[in-house]
Amino acid sequence: LMFCLLLVGLSAEAQKKKKNFKVAIEVDGVCMMCKKRIEKAALNSKGVKFATWDVKTHLLSLIIDENKTDTKTIQKNVAAVGHDTKGIKAKDHVYNGINPCCKYRDKKVVDAHDDL
């Protein structure tokens, strides 16, 4: 009986959500304007304490309160401003509304940024 109680206690502890959970999400973009838009969308998500997007690696590094948000919610919010993530693609009409400089789906735009 004691062994069962110990297992239940350990299981509950393992599922405890963290207030300062570090996670990274891959987000498509090409420039500093993209960076600003992506970070703003992430930071406007309830429970996000820190967000920084790296132009070269396309990784959005986050510190989140898992009691208030999750990565899927953040991905939805980032896609809502026009940026694809690994899990969620931005709607075409939203993507088409971003600045021409930020059209990360266009190989010519991506190549032009690689030359910088």
Language-model features: locations:
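Helix N-cap motif at beta-to-alpha junctions
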Residues: D65-T71
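Short, low-order "capping/linker" segments at domain edges
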Residues: Y95-L116
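Conserved short beta-strand edge segments in small beta-sheet-based binding/regulatory domains
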Residues: G82-V94
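A generic structural motif
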Residues: H58-D65
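Bacterial Sec-dependent N-terminal signal peptides
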Residues: L1-K19
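Short amphipathic alpha-helices in soluble, non-transmembrane regions
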Residues: R37-A41, T73-G82
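N-terminal targeting signals for Sec/Tat export/insertion, comprising classic cleavable signal peptides
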Residues: F21-F50
